[in-house]
Amino acid sequence: MSDTEQELQRVIRRHYREKRELQAHIQTLKASVPKNDKGRRKQMLADISRLEAEMEQRHKQELEKFGENPDSSVDSVTADLEKMNLENMPPRPPKAQKRRDRRAHQERRHQERMPAAQAEQLAANRREEEEKVAAILGAKNLEMKTIPADGHCMYRAIQDQLVFSVTIESLRYRTAYYMRKHIDDFLPFFTEPEAGNFYTREDFLRYCDDIVHNASWGGQLELRALSHVLQTPIEVVQANSPTIVIGEEYTRKPVTLVYLHYACDFGEHYNSVKPIEVAGAFGGMAPRLF
């Protein structure tokens, strides 16, 4: 096999992995927005459509750089990859799920023609949320610090405030490990987003695998696990709800996260915080809060 063919196969394998990661991210997005919040669901579906189109276009451009039609190679490598991952793939979706997917696709197409008034309302909600959060944080002499919206935002916001060096991969692994070791403390809180059925132990273990291997978004249950892992309280500031404190049994200075509903195009998002910089003070990075 030539070097060009080997490189092509590496690219195709990466594309396959990226597609699976995007699908996992999409499922998390769908579960994160309440069904009765039509405005946010429409925005979320439009974001999903854009993400899919951007990935498809990028993959196409990368394959075209090889100077030939790679369709046959793509089919061959993809078939091999699917065979390798067959045992780890979830079961095929039932007919009801397929109908929901079709409706979601139709809604995405409708969302592409969202009236300007709705876009203006979303922007207004975003500004209002940011102003309220700024007031809450200002009372603590803090201000919001933007974290990338890449599916790792919760873990990145925590990483940003720790005095010791730790990778996102390590935080995800330690979160999943703790949840597996204390499955009875977490399992009762997990239900299927659509049907509402409680997770089986197998469902829960697959969920923990996603924490480690995918850019799955985290929530309060993952924060509970992280507070135990770090032995540190974690407080979550929101614009329209009281601040939530997780891990109050620990005495260290808390890590503070900001939970946003409108600041990110993908749906809910976590940001970090930092001390407010005083004008005229000596430069340098603000101290971390751990």
UniProtKB/Swiss-Prot annotation:
InterPro entries to which the protein is assigned, alphabetical: OTU_dom, OTU_OTUD6, Papain-like_cys_pep_sf, Peptidase_C85-like
Molecular function (Gene Ontology), one example: cysteine-type deubiquitinase activity
EC code(s) of this entry: 3.4.19.12
Biological processes annotated in GO: protein K11-linked deubiquitination; protein K27-linked deubiquitination; protein K29-linked deubiquitination; protein K33-linked deubiquitination; proteolysis
Region (Cys-loop): 147-153
Pfam families found in the cross-reference section: OTU
Catalytic activities: Thiol-dependent hydrolysis of ester, thioester, amide, peptide and isopeptide bonds formed by the C-terminal Gly of ubiquitin (a 76-residue protein attached to proteins as an intracellular targeting signal)
Keyword Protease in record: yes
Domain OTU: 142-276
Region of interest (Variable-loop), ranges: 211-221
Signal peptide location: none
Keywords in alphabetical order: Hydrolase, Protease, Thiol protease, Ubl conjugation pathway
Top-level lineage group: Eukaryota
Residue stretches of biased makeup (Basic and acidic residues): 49-68
Annotated spans, His-loop: 259-269
Gene3D superfamilies, alphabetized: 3.90.70.80
Active site: 150, 153, 269
UniProt KW Hydrolase keyword: yes
Region entry Disordered, spans: 27-117
Biased composition (Basic residues): 95-108
Function according to Swiss-Prot or TrEMBL: Deubiquitinating enzyme that hydrolyzes 'Lys-27'-, 'Lys-29'- and 'Lys-33'-linked polyubiquitin chains. Also able to hydrolyze 'Lys-11'-linked ubiquitin chains.
Stated name of the protein: OTU domain-containing protein 6A
Organism, scientific name: Mus musculus (Mouse)
